[in-house]
Amino acid sequence: MASDEIVRNLISREEVMGNLISTASSSVRSPLHDVLCSHVRTIVDSVDKKAVSRKHEDVRRNISSEELQMLINAYPEYAVSSSACESGTHSMAACFRFLETEYLLDMVPMKETFVYDIGGNWFSHMKFRADREIHCCCPILSMRDSERLETRMMAMQKYMRGSKDKPLRLLSRYQNILREQAARTTAFMAGEVNAGVLDGDVFCENTFQDCVRRVPEGFLKTAIAVHSIYDIKVEEFASALKRKGITQAYGCFLFPPAVLIGQKEGILPSVDGHYLVENGRIKFFFANDPNAGYSHDLKDYLKYVEKTYVDIEDGVFAIELMQMRGDTMFFKITDVTAAMYHMKYRGMKRDETFKCIPLLKNSSVVVPLFSWDNRSLKITSGLLPRTLVEQGAAFIMKNKEKDLNVAVLKNYLSAVNNSYIFNGSQVRDGVKIAPDLISKLAVTLYLREKVYRQRENSIISYFEQEMLHDPNLKAMFGDFLWFVPNTLSSVWKNMRKSLMEWFGYAEFDLTTFDICDPVLYVEIVDRYKIIQKGRIPLGEFFDCHEECENYELREKEKNDLAVKMAQKVTGTVTECEKDLGPLVQPIKEILVQLVMPNLVRALCRPRSPTSPLDLKSIPGSTPSHSSSDSEHSMTEEASCTIAGSVPTWEIATRKDLTFQRIDEDMSRRTGMPPRPKVTSSYNMNARAEFLYYQLCSVICERAQILSVIEDFRQNLIFSDKVAVPLNARFYSFQSLRPGWVFKTPSHSEVGHSYAVHFDFKTIGTDLEESLAFCRMVPISWDKSGKYIATTPHFPERHGYYVICDNTKLCNNWLIYNKLVDVYALVADRPLRFELIDGVPGCGKSTMILNSCDIRREVVVGEGRNATDDLRERFKRKKNLNSKTANHRVRTLDSLLLAEGPCVPQADRFHFDEALKVHYGAIMFCADKLGASEILAQGDRAQLPMICRVEGIELQFQSPDYTKTIINPKLRSYRIPGDVAFYLSAKEFYKVKGIPQKVITSNSVKRSLYARGETTPERFVSLLDVPVRKDTHYLTFLQAEKESLMSHLIPKGVKKESISTIHEAQGGTYENVILVRLQRTPNEIYPGGPRSAPYIVVGTSRHTKTFTYCSVTDDKLLLDIADVGGIAHTPIRTFESHIV
């Protein structure tokens, strides 16, 4: 026991621990080395784990490692880093402001909370916090405010005009800001400005006191102020909070504590700033900032520190100083009006508080410093490091009287300035003191030691004399006899001091050399007399029922799991449970078969008075559809009746094809079904083939999803670095914390209407044997405007879910199930089919606009963008309201999915780009509309309908041209003269086998150019693609498009400016560059068996210039660039094609 005590005493000694650490770190073979390394590793691992769980904040500024460490120390709750991608003045102040904003926002709730940010950076909120309701009050009260507004406007324009992807909600706010600024400008010019005009969505130009922004109903209201209350009187601030119904607000401001004890100027070390008190105002400025500083009223500024109670007309607020971080004071202001009522009820008449403001740490001391000023001695006080002063005092105490020397002391102080000796080594610590202060400190310590030695000698002499003789009567009674009252003594001292000054003598105060501790805090007392007034604030109710249910469910799952594990370990399973064990799985399967179809049917049924339960009626759910493929109107509510449906494999394995609705089960793969039998009616054959094509598409898409699930099961998808087919994302309920596996999808990657729900029952070699179930289920997403949440509402909380490209809309499945019923009732009937066969740019859409009686006829389009454009043109020209336009101008998918009153009726309808879709789909449109006449717009020379299912051949995808009325249009308003000549020379357009001449109204004569291996301006790889922002880029293949996007988007080209030829059909652009990046032959490349339509579409999208860039000299390049090609043909040859 004694030895243990000795060891503990030794270890507690600083020099022993230093030697131990030195030995352990220098001697690798020492056992202490392993112990030290293990301990350090444990500490590092602990720090890493804590850092992972912390919120990551990138301050972005270019700062030093010491400054970054200061930020980390000030905000330990964040994992602070810097990408060093920005630079500017007062960088540390900017970094602290960013972290202060995050810290204040973390103090307030997120869900259904409206935050006023007084004077906040609205663009920063708009860019980084688009998911929160934050409104900034940014009035223009000075020239600097106007400059700050324009700076933020420029930053917004720079970001919005950049190449990065942006959420849709950001675009909406961007447009609103520009509209609001235009309205404000108009109001100022007209002299009709008021608070309503200055209001805005993202920010307003009113002061916080005058802000009129309406808060969404049911939202909690709060406010933050990041360095913005300096010029707002605390009484006005509290009154504004009361008017807006804000019960608690948070803020922060720069605060040098020394200003409370009268220090007129000083530094703000954390932000590298300074403050100066002058003429009743306090000024702040920064060391490395040449810009204008900030000046504020000192009295109003100090009220935020000195006051605890803020008395206003209709209530009382209390200010709580929470903490100091760096040079910033955080505060909280709370509505405490309710306390007045409570205290009045209890008979209390007043309330009193005190608070202590910390000033300085105990690491410094106040030292008197001496200097000459105009031939007189000047004494000042300095705040110097305690360590340096104590080291200097200890050093001079060791010297003998004859060795006392100011020069030696200065030498020593200079050597130990901001350092001390530890374990035989010099350790740097603190801030280095200036040389002039070192010199003054040496004089002070020298004089102090002289005076102290004199005092010590006097004390010793006194006691020596007293101890040499015995006390007598005089010694005993002398003090009593010569007693002088304090009043007379004081008078004598004053007379003595005056006489000495009269004769030129000075009385020296021996306490002048004393070194004192500085003031550590300032105590502030505040009192308030209880007066009952104002109204008591009430809080907003937030419905957190779902979160509570989820918590209880997780707790129940934990308890059930613990009980089952304990029963399995102890073997305490009851006999009844053992007997029921074999029956559990069959019972589950029966319940699924009985309950799930009814549930899915109810969720998918179209909304009607007889169907009270649908997806919209579920609280908190919002059906979502793709913004590129769905319609705005009510017909987009896709439904799928499950009753009477069968799995795909049951239809596919039959000998003869019988169309029947498909259910959601996809737990088995299957081959393609047999083709439908051919009848004598071309139109009926087309209908049957379109249904067959839709069925094959569903089978193919589901097989692709099962392949992705198979990759997931075999751990081929094991991290977010792996490129997942179909852009699939997996969500798991297998753990206690459900969530996305590997990677959370971004806001642009969500919005799927369906997901595949699956789980595994065994670990087998075959996927179908391993699956417990696998089915398609509807899901919903929370929406706010165009913003979509990243986690959907799943119908069940177990197993796995996968969303991918094939579950975005599932239109093939929905359309097939809709048309099965239509096909069963349809009969062959005569239809008049007229085709307007026009060259590119002949005005087919304009012809629809001019010839269609939209109130009696219907317009159907193949693509969403073209149909939307056509609908808007109808609304402008025919003065249609939105409801009528949405009802009678439809996309193909929208019409085929519609039911009941959502389907318009018409004897005749127009079909834009009819040859890009299957002829059977057009027949079904006629059946649903009840039409007998079809006026179709198309171009037989351009791209036809493309079969997306491999392994099947379509025979009835085009109209029966022998029974079709064909009306050719050979005049274009788009293509230049050389393109018209080229289309005519290559005989792309014929009428009854006779080549036709294509003409154009475009005055541009030469537009076709080419670059290849042998051209003067060579093109051999992707790196040779010219970068132009006013150009649209085309490719033949999707793989080429992706390569082009990865090369051009980082260089400023927009994503929308790159597409395949098939995607660009119907589009018009001024300048076009067509790129071929693969040398290997392909049937759609120029010269291939299917290349003609691609050449026609690719060369006819432009109005000014077309450049073909190919890595090989194919047919199109030779047609343009070869000797005798278009590029060398005289311009006068093209003039005959221009009218």
Curated annotation (Swiss-Prot):
This is Replication protein alpha-A. Its EC number is 2.1.1.-, 3.6.4.13. InterPro entries: (+)RNA_virus_helicase_core_dom, Alphavirus-like_MT_dom, P-loop_NTPase. The genome of this virus consists of three linear, positive, single-stranded RNAs encapsidated in separate virions designated RNA-alpha, RNA-beta and RNA-gamma. Three proteins (alpha-A, beta-A and gamma-A) are translated directly from these genomic RNAs and the remaining proteins encoded on RNA-beta (beta-B, beta-C and beta-D) and RNA-gamma (gamma-B) are expressed via three subgenomic messenger RNAs. Residues 81-305 form the Alphavirus-like MT domain. The keyword Glycoprotein does not apply. ATP binds at residues 838-845. Residues 60-438 are annotated as: Methyltransferase. One of its GO terms (molecular function) is mRNA methyltransferase activity. Residues 611-637 are annotated as: Disordered. Transmembrane segments: none annotated. The keyword Protein biosynthesis does not apply. Probably contains methyltransferase and helicase activities. Methyltransferase displays a cytoplasmic capping enzyme activity. This function is necessary since all viral RNAs are synthesized in the cytoplasm, and host capping enzymes are restricted to the nucleus. Helicase region probably exhibits NTPase and RNA unwinding activities. Disulfide bonds: none annotated. Residues 617-627 have a biased composition (Low complexity).
